A protein has these predicted regions:
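Catalytic-site microenvironment of enzymes
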Residues: 1-185, 190-227
Length: 227
């Protein structure tokens, strides 16, 4: 179980990554379950929705409507980023994408009647209400498109939040060693946005159907970072 994994990692013992399998649990959709919005109903969780967009492109590299905030000192070529070609190639030779969660217990504000039992500030080990569920949906969507996915559902921030990144790094290194076919590693987190008065907002796109806004954080201190 996850408590056993956490104990092993805390003791400095690495685990052997499992074989790639479709996510399975009562709270986990199968890869066949997604047309991801078909038949879903959405309850208001009481957090006001807000669409945010930069009012100026100053300080950003803009690529096809995506705003890249570049604090690295490396100049980005918008034309090269938008030409549709990538050095990374996905093949059928093995798992291609690894999804992990350094902070797997990061949770979401639930509608009335669906509240979770908290295990920390805006955190829960209930995988139906934390960021692991988001990883399930990403894995299902990629699998539908023929991309082989591994989803590590370990709560690396349980029991000790401060050890989350060393634990998740150890997991990623284990997976990379066992599955050299992996091309992308996604460490999926939940963000939180609030105004100057501390009021929380959920960020959605203005277009229908509404969709949550996402950000990708990428370092450039390694080869292939633009892929």
């Amino acid at each position: 179980g996850r408590s056993t994994v956490a104990a092993l990692l805390s003791a400095g013992v690495t685990r052997d990554p499992p074989e790639p399998v479709a996510p399975e649990s009562p709270d986990t959709p199968s890869s066949a379950a997604s047309s991801l919005t078909d038949g879903l109903t959405f309850a208001d969780n009481g957090v006001p929705a807000q669409t945010t967009a930069p009012t100026s492109s100053k300080g950003y590299t803009v690529v096809n409507g995506v705003y890249l905030k570049n604090s690295s000192g490396t100049e980005l070529d918008a034309d090269a980023l938008s030409d549709g070609s990538f050095a990374a190639q996905l093949t059928d030779d093995g798992p291609q994408v690894l999804i992990v969660h350094s902070h797997g217990s990061e949770a979401y504000t639930m509608p009335a009647g669906q509240e979770y039992t908290p295990t920390g500030s805006f955190r829960t080990d209930n995988d139906a209400c934390n960021v692991v569920r988001v990883g399930d949906e990403i894995a299902a969507a990629l699998s539908e498109r023929g991309i082989s996915v591994l989803h590590d559902r370990t709560l690396h921030d349980v029991p000790d939040y401060n050890d989350a990144y060393p634990h998740s790094l150890a997991s990623v290194e284990d997976y990379m060693e066992k599955y050299p076919s992996l091309v992308f590693v996604l460490d999926v987190h939940r963000d939180a946005v609030s105004d100057a008065d501390g009021n929380q907002y959920k960020l959605v796109s203005a277009e229908e159907p509404h969709a949550a806004q996402m950000s990708f954080i990428m370092g450039n201190a390694y080869d292939g970072w633009q892929e």
